[in-house]
Regions:
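Sec-dependent N-terminal signal peptides
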Residues: 1-10
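Sequence signature of WD/YWTD-type beta-propeller architectures
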Residues: 9-288
Length: 288
């Protein structure tokens, strides 16, 4: 997932961010978070974490001294970082491909075209997934062949595409959407944010089978990114506050954690491990 200025990305220095890791627990449908630990801890852009199916590692995007964006891997057991891709192009938004030993990325090609690509698990054998849909900014896998994509434009559109038909254009199902796309656990649906300057932003979901869009809950202030726990709780961050919304109980958002005492500022992206026991947090150290 790239930020809003995707089209000028190569000419713009990305913001300095780190990735933190914390224990995550759910008791009585309420989330609690352990003390976050900075696992990247360096100057520069480390962002867009996504856990591998094992839950023992996550992939993320890192921009190093040469200004190139490549994919890196953090191993939770060894507490080590390894580089996965080393290409002339820039890769963003690494995401495991369902039922395949590999991952997908948004790749910025030499002519600045942004399309969806796939790599083997070791970062080799790059190949296009969708030929005709561009410029892709963000995306989520709805199942092992259905993709839901944020496609840049004025306004940006939510499009659904089939990886088995790479030459086809996407089907537009919503317009003027936010950047956060997440598969909904237990359902063939993907959540997204519908932006509305009058009524406010809403978290909604699209059923990938029938293309039906359903409102879920109004988004909390300052929150741009949303993630789901395996048991259907949605997490979002605004500033240094972590909020939860329970899709089973409904109701309003609840504040469940404040990261300010732990030295974090401007919390943005979140990622939940497949078992729901770890939370990756993208933030800026308060002292930076």
């Amino acid at each position: 997932m790239l930020w809003t200025v995707l089209l000028t990305l190569q000419a713009t220095a990305p913001p300095a961010t780190d990735i933190y890791l914390a224990d995550l627990r759910v008791a009585g449908r309420t989330v609690s978070v352990g003390t976050p630990v900075n696992v990247t801890a360096r100057p520069g852009y480390d962002n867009q974490p996504c856990f591998l199916p094992s839950g023992r590692a996550f992939l993320y995007t890192s921009v190093r001294e040469d200004g190139q964006a490549d994919i890196y891997r953090y191993d939770l057991d060894r507490k080590t970082i390894s580089q996965v891709t080393a290409t002339r192009e820039s890769e963003y938004s690494p995401t495991p491909i369902p039922n395949v030993a590999g991952f997908s990325v948004v790749r910025v090609e030499p002519d600045s075209t942004q399309r969806l690509w796939a790599f083997d698990a070791d970062g080799t054998r790059p190949r296009l997934i969708l030929d005709s849909i561009k410029p892709v900014g963000y995306y989520a896998w709805g199942d092992d062949h259905t993709l839901v994509l944020f496609v840049l434009g004025s306004p940006p559109t939510l499009q659904i595409a089939d990886a088995r038909s790479p030459a086809k254009l996407g089907e537009v199902v919503a317009r003027d959407i936010g950047r956060s796309l997440q598969r909904v656990p237990g359902r063939q649906a993907v959540s997204f944010v519908q932006r509305d300057s009058v009524a406010g932003n809403w978290l909604e979901e699209v059923d990938i089978r029938v293309r039906r869009v359903t409102k879920l809950v109004k988004a909390p202030p300052q929150a741009d990114f949303f993630v789901w726990t395996p048991d259907g709780i949605v997490l979002a961050a605004g500033g240094t506050t972590l909020y939860q919304w329970d899709s089973q109980r409904g109701g309003e958002w609840e504040a469940v954690a404040d990261f300010a005492p732990t030295g974090l500022a401007n919390v943005t992206r979140l990622a939940v491990s497949p078992k729901g026991d770890r939370l990756a947090i993208v933030a800026v150290p308060a002292t930076r």
